[in-house]
Amino acid sequence: TATICDTLAVALAGAADPRASALLATLAGGPVQAPGCARGLAAVDAALWFGLCAHLLDYDDDETERAMAHLSVPCLAAALALAGDDGALLSEAYVTGCKAMLMLGAAWNPALHGAGWHPSSVLGVFGAAAAASRMLALSEAQSVEALRLAAALASGTRGAFGGMGKPL
């Protein structure tokens, strides 16, 4: 889709930023080749690095009505890190993650944003968990547990804007 291509393009641009290089220097090697990365990374690190690169310049997509968030970065980062060469499954997982963010965003916004939370961060962990659940073909019980873990990790205030906290 166009949003996947857009996210890949902004991630490649972000990969040239010195802040992306600084993060990359802290990450161990592994088998996953993240777009724009000169070396392989562990899946979790590939998702982290790609997510940072894709959101670093703040040109990624922005859904402004329900989720009030950048949908593509967390969903695509999780799906790409687990995709291998299965493009069809990657697309399904990406859409699954975006739908999760949209459903939660419709329930929680505009109050979430109005209370000072950054919806991309708060909702993004759910989108990433949903996308990863699809990529890994988790059972319903396993997917529920992945979403519970996402709830435990959901955070991100708009007070982080202006620093590395926003793209991270």
Which residues make up each language-model segment?
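N-terminal core-entry segment
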Residues: 1-168
